[in-house]
Design a protein with these regions (language model features):
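Alpha-helical transmembrane segments of multi-pass membrane proteins
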Residues: 1-296
């Protein structure tokens, strides 16, 4: 068989493998997103205990959640991209999320006492808010950093560069759709009927299932690291500004609505759901738009 035919056949087989694993990977991202935002609601309730108010818990957890995700993506993303086993990275991240989140739920009383002692009985506002954000970030960092690495890991499993971005759009939309379901289920169903610990256990089971099932997905060869181009840097700046404005508006609306609503956590859950629905719809629309312009 001529070498050219071998290379073409290998490329076709690789494309078939990616296509065959795209939807199973999306289902894993739905479950992972459900667990992640379920944890966020659980952590918001926990943080409200040691910070003394639900609005403080919302702001601290939002900052710690997205800050940890950014740290994880920046710190682990390049290593995962160069790895020959991104599926194992993904499984390891899901396992770490499950273990750390269960530990936080089990040690809720101990963590609350430690944070209250750290803050003190009558803290100055600057001291109180500094410790609220810093302490919450450090407490949640292992889990949130692992969350930040899951999307790059699954993206590496599928090999985004070969399909014009359709895989990453599908994964992002699926992850966000799962997040919507996780917010609603945790805030309005699981926590009221099962409590914080059992809700965290439900989310942890999903993480463990994702960890095990992800090992069955195809693994692509490790990719060579590439330096970001000026165009890529400008896109990152745009995405940073978009995230800043999007979450900033969300927190602002939560702050305003606390003046007229009784329960900040439920208000936050509803607003977060609306934000995530729009984000998922945009990612799905982008994926369809790209698919009409890029050959499979």
């Amino acid at each position: 068989v001529p070498p050219a035919s071998v290379s073409v056949s290998a490329a076709l087989l690789a494309a078939d493998a990616r296509t065959g694993h795209r939807w199973p990977a999306a289902m894993l991202m739905v479950a992972s997103g459900f667990a992640a935002l379920g944890y966020q609601i659980v952590w918001t309730q926990q943080a409200s205990l040691w910070l003394g108010h639900e609005s403080a818990g919302v702001f601290a957890v939002v900052a710690a959640f997205f800050g940890g995700i950014a740290i994880g993506a920046l710190a682990l993303g390049p290593r995962i991209e160069r790895s020959a086993s991104p599926g194992r990275w993904y499984a390891g991240c899901e396992l770490l999320i499950a273990v750390w989140s269960i530990a936080l739920a089990v040690m809720l009383d101990d963590v609350t006492r430690a944070m209250l002692q750290w803050i003190g009985p009558s803290p100055a506002p600057a001291w109180h808010w500094s410790l609220a954000f810093t302490g919450t970030l450090l407490v949640l960092l292992p889990a949130t950093a692992a969350m930040g690495a899951t999307l790059p890991a699954m993206e590496s499993v599928l090999g985004r560069r070969h399909d014009g971005g359709r895989s990453i759009a599908l994964l992002y939309a699926a992850n966000t759709l799962g997040a919507v379901m996780g917010v609603l289920a945790a805030a309005f169903l699981l926590i009221p009927h099962m409590g914080l610990l059992r809700t965290a256990l439900v989310c942890a089971v999903l993480n463990l299932l994702c960890a095990g099932l992800s090992l069955t997905l195809a693994v692509r060869p490790a990719a060579a690291a590439t330096a970001p181009t000026p165009a890529a840097r400008s896109v990152l700046v745009t995405l940073f500004a978009t995230g800043l404005l999007g979450i900033g508006y969300e927190v602002l609306v939560v702050r305003v609505l606390t003046q007229v609503t009784e329960n900040t956590v439920y208000t936050f859950a509803i607003l977060l759901t609306l934000y995530l629905v729009g984000t998922a719809a945009g990612a799905a629309a982008f994926g369809r738009w790209v698919s009409t312009r890029v050959e499979p």
